[in-house]
Design a protein with these regions (language model features):
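Membrane-proximal transmembrane or re-entrant/amphipathic helices at the cytosolic face
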Residues: 440-491
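Interfacial segments at transmembrane-helix termini and the short loops linking adjacent helices
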Residues: 108-128, 312-344
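Membrane-interface junctions at transmembrane-helix termini in multi-pass inner-membrane proteins
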Residues: 134-157, 202, 206, 337-371
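Hydrophobic alpha-helical transmembrane segments
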Residues: 122, 126, 155-203, 221, ...
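Signature of the first transmembrane helix
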Residues: 4-67, 92-105, 162-166, 170, ...
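Helix-loop junctions and terminal segments of transmembrane helices
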Residues: 61-78, 147, 258, 262-302, ...
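N-terminal membrane topogenesis motif
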Residues: 1-28, 80-88, 212-228, 472-491
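Interhelical loop/hinge segments that connect adjacent transmembrane helices in multipass membrane
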Residues: 1-8, 180-182, 186, 196-236, ...
């Protein structure tokens, strides 16, 4: 058990580093995006809408085939056809993206009119789609690197994409003043660089054989996953689409800043945990302790995520001031805690999904997420006209909570896993309590306020000891870890 957790932790660090490298672009460039010299607040709102459309495009036109490939690739029954399955998925993705790009290119003015009530973003639309198409093709082989546990190579390619994309973005936006279009031109160049780097693995892991029957099986498994993924993306993006239609692009710009900061929890921490854990969980399916491993991984993943949630929530104003010098953006700090706390339910939902993935109940997953997405849309329609930013953030938090509850009960009916719900509830209550306690320091001088907030974050793991969050053996291992590294530091 402990060796599996250590293996997952090691993978989390490496994949986390790779994920950080990719997502750092969105964080590093915030001071540029929020500087009126380069992008207006309306431009940043356009970027926010384009970002979520980019995510949706990848999900829809990728058909979740890379996820299906992962499920079939690890199955011993299909070991002899791994390369032909990989070839099949790559070819199908390339064909779909090529045909779809032609359609988007021809109808980009109409798509721009639909999104922004103007056709002036038509060029931006097809550049964005070209970038997402390259991402769809390369993501299949990037998934293969994960399945083959080539974490270092995965990280190297990801970091190279970061450097290329970051450098070209700065060149296009800061020096050539190409506005939002320059952002996606740079993204396209970065994706092409990543595809070139992974191309050797594409050829190495392919043989010229089209697996028609297996493709149908993967589509049968993957299409419900695509529905789930589309619904999930809509669930996470209806807030900005709704703000775009019910408010204005300036409001979308403020919300986008808050969401980008809060969403670092998902794209860096939660995604890294999932990238590392999922292959280990599927390999351990035959082990007698695999259910306990899943439950324990939930506990410690939740603790890690809650620590980051507290950091972003307690220091939201300071973080916003660092990234955005324009005072008009500072209101974003007030909704970061709501968006951040929604991430704990996203993380737990991803974990309980495992039961449905193991039993291949992808259709149920799609239905549940679709229902929650519609519920979220209804909440947005109800709350945004009256509460604007706060309504959108509250809608996100409530919807993620509802989705976790639905997935937990349905998943447990299909595949029972002994999750420690009491410990998870105590963790969430402790996190909320510490955040509320931090509010008393709102008018303190800067240094005492910062120190007090840091103390509250450090207190969280210790507060869980009397609440019996840890088992005795876990406390013993923690003590041994502290003693070991204390000796190394003071040697």
């Amino acid at each position: 058990m402990l060796s599996s957790i250590k293996s997952a932790a090691k993978g989390t660090v490496i994949y986390g580093f790779a994920n950080v490298s990719i997502k750092l672009i969105g964080i590093i460039l915030i001071p540029i995006y929020t500087n009126y010299t380069y992008l207006s607040k309306e431009d940043f709102g356009v970027l926010g809408v384009m970002d979520i459309t980019y995510q949706l495009t990848i999900i829809v036109f990728g058909l979740s085939l890379y996820q299906s490939l992962a499920r079939w690739y690890l199955d011993p029954e299909h070991k002899s056809s791994q390369k032909s399955m990989h070839f099949t998925v790559v070819i199908i993705n390339m064909a779909i993206c090529a045909v779809s790009f032609l359609f988007v290119y021809l109808f980009s003015p109409q798509i721009s009119e639909l999104l922004f009530s103007s056709d002036k973003f038509s060029r931006l639309i097809w550049i964005m789609f070209a970038s997402s198409s390259v991402n769809i093709v390369s993501s299949v082989s990037m998934m293969l690197l994960r399945l083959q546990e080539k974490a270092i190579k995965y990280a190297v390619i990801s970091i190279t994409k970061l450097i290329v994309t970051l450098g070209v973005t700065i060149l296009f936006v800061v020096f050539w003043h190409r506005n939002v279009q320059g952002v996606y031109e740079a993204m396209l160049i970065g994706e092409i660089a990543g595809l070139i780097l992974i191309s050797a693995d594409i050829f190495r892991n392919s043989i010229l054989k089209f697996e028609y029957k297996k493709l149908l099986q993967m589509l049968n498994y993957g299409l419900p996953l695509m529905l789930a993924s589309v619904s999930s993306v809509l669930l996470n993006t209806f807030d900005r689409y709704s703000l775009n239609y019910l408010s204005d692009l300036d409001t979308v710009g403020t919300y986008t800043l808050a969401f980008r900061i809060a969403n670092t929890i998902k794209v860096v921490v939660i995604s890294s945990i999932q990238l590392s854990l999922i292959p280990i969980i599927f390999r351990k399916m035959g082990d007698p302790d695999h259910k306990r491993f899943i439950a324990k991984s939930m506990n410690y993943s939740a603790l890690l995520v809650m620590l980051v949630i507290l950091f972003l929530s307690l220091f939201s104003l300071e973080i916003v001031k660092v990234f955005a010098s324009n005072v008009s953006y500072w209101e974003a700090a007030s909704i970061i805690p709501l968006l951040s706390f929604s991430m704990i339910f996203i993380m737990m939902k991803e974990n309980v999904l495992i039961g449905l993935q193991i039993t291949k109940n992808s259709f149920i997953m799609g239905l549940l997420i679709a229902f929650t997405a519609l519920f979220n849309l209804g909440l947005n329609m109800l709350l945004i006209p009256r509460y604007l930013l706060y309504g959108a953030a509250a809608s996100t938090l409530i919807s993620q909570m509802v989705m976790f509850i639905l997935f937990y009960f349905i998943s447990q009916r299909k595949y029972v896993i002994p999750y420690e719900l009491k410990n998870l509830l105590l963790l969430i209550i402790a996190g909320i309590g510490l955040y509320c306690l931090s509010l008393v320091s709102g008018h303190w001088p800067l240094l005492p306020r910062l120190l007090f907030k840091l103390l509250l974050i450090v207190l969280l793991p210790m507060l869980l000891i009397p609440l019996k969050f840890y088992e005795p053996i876990e406390l013993q291992r923690i003590k041994e870890f502290i003693v070991k590294y204390k000796k190394m530091i003071f040697k």
